[in-house]
């Protein structure tokens, strides 16, 4: 068994030696032309070519939270897309970034109801919808819906639905539900999402109309990894 022995001026040495078992063929490793950066490691391309690469970052690279900033009125059975101000009465309900909450990495962007991702990757979305019924009004269903497009809005597909209901009683009745979805975003210019609400007899979507920095109806985005 042969080895390369590098002797220090103090007398001790460091050696590179062959594998314990005989390789199936001759193996050649080609070193990179320059030194890497601090913390990088050598990686092979499977053909013996070595290069310096950075280790993947541990933990989540991106977490972002968006909050509906006003209440929104739903008609009976109608689906409304939250953030599209043309569908609402009693004020403009828009998505605003919850900058008072902790976030990680790059932010989502939104135009009316459509969210665009900051980079490609696998994303998890947790959409919480809070609604209230007027006195003595029942709702057999209240749905939170997540829609995706992979062709920049030419087609939209409902990918997640979460349902609840509300009893009829005197006074205001609050309900909330949560829909979740994981989306493989391979192209940020075409892969986008939007969030909707629907109720049987109509209801009001609760938003942060008083700007008290409370999350009522909101979405949490997490980038889980590369596509």
Task: Please identify what each model-predicted range represents.
Residues 1-58, 198-202, 224-227:
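Extracellular repetitive beta-rich solenoid segments
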Residues 1-3, 11, 26, 39, ...:
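Surface-exposed or flexible loop/turn and strand-edge residues in extracellular/cell-surface modules
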Residues 20, 31-34, 119, 129-133, ...:
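Non-cytosolic beta-sheet module surface loops
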Residues 30, 116, 182-184, 220:
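Generic structural detector for well-ordered beta-strands
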Residues 55-139, 144, 148, 162, ...:
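Terminal (often C-terminal
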Residues 109-111, 140-144, 148-187:
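Glycine-rich strand-loop-strand elements at beta-sheet edges
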Residues 121-131, 175-180, 191-199:
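Extracellular beta-strand-rich recognition modules
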């Amino acid at each position: 068994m042969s080895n390369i022995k590098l002797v220090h001026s103090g007398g001790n040495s460091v050696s590179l030696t062959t594998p314990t078992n005989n390789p199936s063929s001759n193996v050649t490793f080609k070193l990179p032309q320059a030194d890497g950066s601090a913390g990088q490691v050598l990686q092979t391309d499977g053909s013996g070519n070595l290069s310096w690469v950075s280790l993947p970052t541990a933990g989540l690279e991106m977490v972002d939270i968006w909050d509906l900033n006003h209440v929104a009125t739903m008609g009976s059975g109608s689906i409304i897309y939250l953030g599209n101000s043309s569908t609402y009465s009693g004020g403009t309900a828009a998505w605003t970034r919850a900058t008072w909450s902790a976030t990680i990495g790059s932010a989502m962007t939104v135009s009316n109801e459509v969210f665009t991702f900051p980079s490609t990757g696998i994303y998890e979305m947790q959409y919480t919808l809070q609604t209230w019924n007027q006195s003595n009004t029942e709702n057999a269903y209240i749905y939170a819906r997540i829609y995706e497009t992979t062709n920049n809005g030419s087609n939209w597909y409902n990918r997640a639905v979460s349902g609840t209901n509300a009893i009829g009683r005197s006074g205001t009745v609050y309900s909330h539900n949560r829909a979740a979805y994981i989306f493989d975003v391979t192209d940020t210019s075409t892969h986008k999402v939007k969030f909707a609400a629907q109720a049987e007899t109509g209801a009001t979507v609760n938003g942060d109309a008083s700007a008290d920095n409370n999350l009522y109806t909101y979405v949490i985005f997490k980038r889980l990894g590369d596509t």
